[in-house]
Design a protein with these regions (language model features):
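Juxtamembrane cytosolic interface motif at the C-terminal end of transmembrane helices
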Residues: 21-27
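Bacterial N-terminal signal peptides
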Residues: 11-21
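Bacterial N-terminal signal peptides that target proteins for export
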Residues: 1-12
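Beta-strand-enriched cores of mature, soluble protein domains
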Residues: 27-148
Length: 148
């Protein structure tokens, strides 16, 4: 009987390990939203762009078509390289829960940030978020969350 238990436990373990990659792949999700940057404020320094400046905001979030308001976000960045990049941390709040991100925000071009977790439907979230400028003024951004 002990031999059968060992075989059963081994088969069960192998079965779980074989299915695990498919379960993870099935739970992968992409969420595309738009941030309208209307409250951004740079503080903690002169009016010049300089390392150490702090950017803060609490903006509204819209669906991918930029029509319907579906949430909000709030966060901060610290200027690291003048004219090039910020180091940021923020949370996007949606009806099903929140998603936290952290990483480098570039002054030009797309940025890729790490998803650091979430709440509600996004509890334990990981993956990356692509941030894309919708216009040259920097008043609207696509947030494309690639959840694992």
């Amino acid at each position: 009987m002990t031999g059968n238990r060992v075989r059963y436990a081994l088969l069960l373990t192998v079965g779980v390990l074989a299915v695990a990659p498919f379960a993870a792949a099935a739970s992968a999700q992409t969420i595309h939203v738009v941030e309208r940057a209307t409250t951004d404020a740079v503080t903690n320094g002169s009016k010049q762009d300089q390392a150490g400046n702090v950017l803060t905001w609490h903006n509204k979030i819209y669906d991918a078509a930029n029509k319907k308001r579906i949430g909000r976000d709030a966060g901060y960045c610290i200027r690291i390289i003048v004219g090039k990049s910020w180091e940021c941390s923020w949370t996007t709040y949606l009806e099903a829960g929140s998603i936290g991100v952290q990483g480098q925000f570039l002054d030009k071009g797309d940025s890729e940030l790490a998803i650091t977790g979430g709440t509600g439907a996004y509890a334990g979230a990981s993956g990356t978020m692509t941030l894309h400028y919708r216009n040259k003024k920097g008043t609207a951004f696509d947030f494309i969350f690639h959840l694992k």
